[in-house]
Regions:
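Positively charged n-region of N-terminal signal peptides that target proteins for export
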Residues: 1-4
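Bacterial N-terminal signal peptides
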Residues: 7-15
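Short, solvent-exposed loop/hinge segments that bridge or flank secondary-structure elements
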Residues: 22-53, 75-87, 105-106, 110
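Edge beta-strand at a domain terminus
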Residues: 59-67, 96-114
Length: 114
C-alpha cells in the first residue's frame, strides 16, 4: 500500500510543470535601442519593475502567472503603462537565458540575469 501511495505521489509531482524556477530573480532590462530600461524582479506570483527613467509610469509592482516558457503579466504598471502582456524565456548566447518582454504587437525589452 505504501508503495502505491509513493508511486502516485511521485507521478503527481513529476506531471506538474515547473513553476518559477527559470524566471525567478532579478533581471536587467534593455529596450529596443539597447539602452538600459530598468530592473525586473520576479518572485513567486509577483513582480516589481524599477525604470531607469525618473517618474516613469511603468515602475511598480503587479502579479504574474507562471508558465513553463515564461510569464503572463496579469496587472500592474508594466501591463497598464507599457502594455506588456508576456515575458518569454529564450536562449541567450552570453547569459544562457533571457526574458523577452512582449506587447501584442512587438518585443519591447530584453532582460538578462543580474
Amino acid at each position: 500500500m505504501r508503495r502505491i501511495a509513493l508511486i502516485a505521489a511521485l507521478a503527481a509531482l513529476t506531471a506538474t510543470p515547473a513553476f518559477a524556477q527559470n524566471f525567478t530573480g532579478n533581471w536587467a532590462c534593455r529596450d529596443a535601442t539597447t539602452a538600459k530600461a530598468g530592473i525586473l524582479t520576479i518572485y513567486g506570483e509577483v513582480y516589481g519593475f524599477a525604470s531607469t527613467t525618473a517618474n516613469d509610469g511603468s515602475s511598480g509592482t503587479g502579479t504574474i502567472t507562471g508558465y513553463q516558457d515564461g510569464v503572463s503579466f496579469n496587472d500592474g504598471n508594466l501591463r497598464t503603462g507599457k502594455a506588456i502582456q508576456a515575458g518569454r524565456i529564450i536562449p541567450d548566447p552570453t547569459y544562457g537565458t533571457a526574458i523577452q518582454l512582449e506587447t501584442a504587437e512587438a518585443i519591447v525589452m530584453l532582460c538578462t540575469p543580474r
